[in-house]
Amino acid sequence: MYTRYNYLQFDFSSITEPGIYMLEYGDQRTAPFPIATDVFQKAWFPTLDVFFPVQMDHMFVREAYRVWHGAAHLDDALQAPVNRIHWDGWRQGPTTGNKYKPLEHIPGLNVGGWFDAGDFDIQTGSQHAVVQVFALLWESFGVNRDETTINQKTRYTEIHVPDGKPDVLQQIEHGVLQLVAQVNAIGYAIPGINESHLYQYRHLGDAVNKTDNLVYNPRLDSLQTDGRTSGTPDDRWAFTNRTPHMNYGTAISLAAASRALKDYNPELSKEALRVARFIWDDEHNHQANPEEQTYSGRFSNPEFMKSIECRAAFELWRSTDYEGYKTKMNELLPTLLEQFNRNASVIAQMIPFMDNAFKKQVRPLVEAYAGELAEVDKENPYGVRISTAGWAGNRNIVQACITNYLLHRSYPELINPEYIYRGLNYLYGCHPCHNLSFVSGVGAQPKKVAYGSNRADFSFIPGGVVPGIRILKPDFPENREDYPFLWSENELSLIHISEPTRP
C-alpha cells in the first residue's frame, strides 16, 4: 500500500520475446507498450531535437512551416533597480554591485542562454546545469547527433534540418555565450535576467513580442524611436547581486565546456577557460561583504561553499593540468566526502581521474549510499523517492538517475543498474495517479498538456519534462492532464532534464 491505494506488481521475468504488450486487471487496461532491448535508444531524441532548440533565447526558431518564436530580447538588459523584490522571487539589493546605475543598459547580454521554463527568464543556475550536463554527455559518449541548424551569427535555429555539426556542442556553445557575456559585461556571474513588468511575466505566445527589441533610451518619449533605441522601458532587468556560489557555478560550467568546445570552437573554448580562471582568481582576491552573504541564502554555509569551490578546482585542474588547482581540490576533498549524498555525482566524476587510494576511500560511502537506495523500496512500490513537497519531484528523480549511472560506472558491483531504470520507468509512466509519460512526446501515453510557452493552447513542447506527481494533503497523488497552468505539476523546466551537480 502507498498513500491510500493498494498496488499490484506484475512480474515480467517470463516475457522473453520482443513485441507490443498490454496489461489488464479487472476493467483496467494499459495502453500498448513495447518490450525490447532498444526501447530507450531514441527516447531522448525529442529533448535534444526540439525542446532545447525551442528554449533558445535570442534566436529565431523555426520548425518546418511553424515559427516557435522570433529572436527575442535583443534589447537585453537594463540594470535592475536597487532595493527591489520581484514578483517571481528575484531580489536586487541596496546597490547594483557594479559600475552600472539602476535602469542603465548593460551591453552584451543579448546573446545565448535558454528560457528557464514556461516563462521567458534566464536563470543562471539553470544555465549552469544545462552546460554541465551537456559537457558531461559529450565527454562520456561523444554524442554527435545532428538534427538542428544553429547559426549564432544570424541568430537562426531550424529544427529537423541538420547542418553537419553536433547539436550537443552547439547547445554548449549557446549556453557559454551567455555565461561569458555576463562576466565580461559586469565582472562576475549574476543570478539572471527577468521581465521588468508584470504583464510581460504573464505573456503567452511568441517571446519576441514581449519587448520592442530596441534598447531603452530615457532621452526619448515613451513611444518614440530613433531606429536603434526607443523610449519604451520594456527591456528585461538584469539582477546583479554578487554571490560566491553563482560565480563558482559559472567557473565550473565554463571550465567543463572549454574541453568540449576545444576542437569545435577553439576561440570560444579559450575564452571560456580564461573567464573561468578569472572568476577563480577574482573570488580568492575578493572580500565578500555582508550583502553578498545575505543574498547567498542557504548557499552561504561554509560546508557548501567548500564543496562548490572543490568542484571548481577539479574542473579547472582537468582543463589546465595546473597543480595549484589540484592542491586546492585535495585540500577541500574531505568536506566534499563528508557531504557524500549531496556531492555523489561530482565525486563519481572525479574517480576516473584520481588514484586507486581515492577510489578505495570512497567505496564505503558508496556502500552506505547503496543501502539507502535499497531502503527506498520500503517507501513506495516504484523504488524512487517521490516528493511530498509543494513542487513535484521529477527533478530529484532525474538527478538520482544521473548520479546512479555515474556511480555504477565506477562501482558496478555496488550500484545495480536497476536503480537507473527505475527512475526512467517512473518518468515514462510507471507512477501513481495515471500512467502518462512525464516526457512530452515520448512513451506509450505521453503528456499532451503542459505549462510551456504554448500553454495557452493546452499543448506541449516535445521532449520537455514536467515536475510530475504532487501529494496533496492528506494523501492524494495528483498530476493534472486537463489543466496546464499548475506549474508545480506541469511546468516544462530546464532543471527537470539537466541536474548533474546542481545543489
Regions found by a protein language model. Name each.
Residues 131-138, 180, 310-311, 399, ...:
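Structural recognition of the beta-strand scaffold that forms the well-ordered cores
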